[in-house]
């Protein structure tokens, strides 16, 4: 049946939208943090990225101003992999980090011989290198030590452009809440899940977004979500997905 709550569209919005103090980005989005990120195109450049990030961990050695820090984001793939769904997923994920509103700027570190080539990723993601997105390749920089040194230098060059960014009042519609089913114990079912559900409902009423991963976990409660669907079409997609799992 296709009638699992589809007629009750969830449209209750608040009159006065909540706000928070965030970092407004050039693309109009807002973040809750102000980091410089060090990304990797491949697992082989993970150590270099970690060393670059660690160079800024010692408090007081570098004037970061309003930057929250320099953090490395590494993963375990990108090297000898098939150019299929796995590579596409990796590139989408990298693009999401590169454009994340919590990152003022990013440095992307590659090895040089990996399947996930940085130029190909940039082109596919519609990104361009510039002041907010810089890249480097270990095999072109003279090895690990020289790449770390150059990477630290590049981040230091980036810091002055972003350490003076000020927090400003922005609407709660900029917020996205990410949810994942953790331990399936009594506490999650009795306290955590209902509490987070209420928080997600409240955020959505203020124009924000909530994302729940692990889709099968909503089995048996899909009618509660279809009632909140923005349209019947969206509600039907939820029902179709659950029926696919059946």
Please report, for each region that a protein language model flagged, where it lies by residue.
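Single conserved hydrophobic/aromatic residue that forms the stacking wall/gate
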Residues: 1-6, 10
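Buried, small/hydrophobic-residue-enriched core segments of structured protein domains
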Residues: 11-244
């Amino acid at each position: 049946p296709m009638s699992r709550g589809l007629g009750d569209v969830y449209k209750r919005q608040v009159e006065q939208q909540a706000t928070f103090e965030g970092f407004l980005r050039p693309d109009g989005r807002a973040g809750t943090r102000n980091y410089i990120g060090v990304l990797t195109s491949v697992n082989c450049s993970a150590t270099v990225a970690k060393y670059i990030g660690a160079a800024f961990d010692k408090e007081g050695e570098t004037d970061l101003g309003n930057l929250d820090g320099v953090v490395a984001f590494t993963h375990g793939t990108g090297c000898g992999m098939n150019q299929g769904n796995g590579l596409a997923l990796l590139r989408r994920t990298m693009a999401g980090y590169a454009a994340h509103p919590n990152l003022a700027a990013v440095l992307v570190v590659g090895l040089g011989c990996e399947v996930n080539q940085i130029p190909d990723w940039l082109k596919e993601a519609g990104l361009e290198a510039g002041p907010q997105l810089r890249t480097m390749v270990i095999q072109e920089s003279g090895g690990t030590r020289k790449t770390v040194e150059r990477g630290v230098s590049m981040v230091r060059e980036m810091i002055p452009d972003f350490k003076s960014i000020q927090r400003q009042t922005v609407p709660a519609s900029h917020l996205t809440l990410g949810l994942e089913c953790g331990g399936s114990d009594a506490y999650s079912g009795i306290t955590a899940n209902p509490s987070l559900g209420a928080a997600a409902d409240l955020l959505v009423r203020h124009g924000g977004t909530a994302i729940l991963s692990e889709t099968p976990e909503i089995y048996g409660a899909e009618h509660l979500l279809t009632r909140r669907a923005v349209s019947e079409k969206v509600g039907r997609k939820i029902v179709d997905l659950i029926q696919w799992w059946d």
